[in-house]
Amino acid sequence: MLGKYVCETEPLSPGLRRLMWRFLQNKNLNTFHAQELRFIHLVLCKMYNFGLNVYLLREATANAGTYDEVVLGRKVPAEVWKLVYDGLEEMGVSSEMLLCEAYRDSLWMHLNDKVGLLRGLANYLFHRLGVTHDVRIAPENLVDGNFLFNLGSVLPCRLLLAAGYCLAFWGSDEHERWVRFFAQKLFICYLIVSGRLMPQRSLLVWASETGYPGPVEAVCRDIRSMYGIRTYAVSGYLPAPSEAQLAYLGAFNNNAV
């Protein structure tokens, strides 16, 4: 048992265990070895891809059989459509074509017929958000007829914004503490979704009785309390967000924290 409510499904490897303890002890990322940092970066990329595809599948299921643009676009921020517009311009689509409904319909049919173009448009959006690794979208999600609506709906999700923030500002001393804060949560989440850590159902009851902080933070607190590791208040070590941080985390007029 790692905590009162958390156990290992099988013993963690020495490397994973070392990383987990360093994160739980809130160690500065600059003290990690190069191999550890490369692995953490890989985990962040994997979590971004995993979260993106899970959210896209959720939206595709929710929007199945829906053709009403108002309904489909209900969760898509205007900022996303501006990125899509810029991406289409980069692909050579003129403003005149986008203003004509017939041209828009033909363009959408063309993009769906040429999945490579649709993937390229999605990659443009990711790059504008600072996510430059090879984002792998499951073919089933990519060929969904409502893909752009689905993608626009999920980009503001907290998990994707947190992972995207870490990837966009990876290696920047100015952003280290915020990257560390998000990377810690994402690493513990990775251990849970990969089946290495198994929270008990009673964890949620305990968390709800102690000022419910969220499932991942509840796991962190449980393990820390078991081993006597100090729990750091967010306000105690996180600086006030800079303009660059607020611009990224609030890019879609939402609260990512």
From Swiss-Prot:
The gene is ORF18. Interacts with ORF30. Interacts with ORF34. Transmembrane segments: none annotated. Plays a role in the expression of late transcripts bridging viral DNA replication and late gene expression during infection. It comes from Human herpesvirus 8 type P (isolate GK18) (HHV-8). Coiled coil: none annotated. One of its GO terms (cellular component) is host cell nucleus. This is Protein UL79 homolog. It is found in: Host nucleus; Host cytoplasm. It holds the Pfam family Herpes_UL79.
